[in-house]
Amino acid sequence: MNVVTVPGEMKDHKVLVYALSTCVWCKRTKEFLKDRKVHYEYVDVDLASPEDRKRIEDDLRRLNCYSYPAVLIDDRRLIVGFKLNDLKEALELR
């Protein structure tokens, strides 16, 4: 799986973004995190190999996640969609 790391000063939380390369809300979510200097990783699911894509989609389905972006924080909280207030709260941002 091609996971991309975006370095940032804020490393208080483990953040993984599941995105689609063509999704404007996914792009905005990644920009939001980068602008706030959050260290995070992302994977563009539509660009993953067929095997990786199936595994990712199966994992997300088990979490009742059927849309993007999906932001997994600290391996326990999942935020689905472009929800800035939820991201700010979960990441303790202003």
Regions found by a protein language model. Name each.
Residues N2-H39:
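Local sequence-structure signature of Cys/Sec-based thiol-disulfide redox active-site neighborhoods
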Residues I73-R94:
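Non-catalytic, surface beta->alpha helical segment in thiol-disulfide oxidoreductase systems
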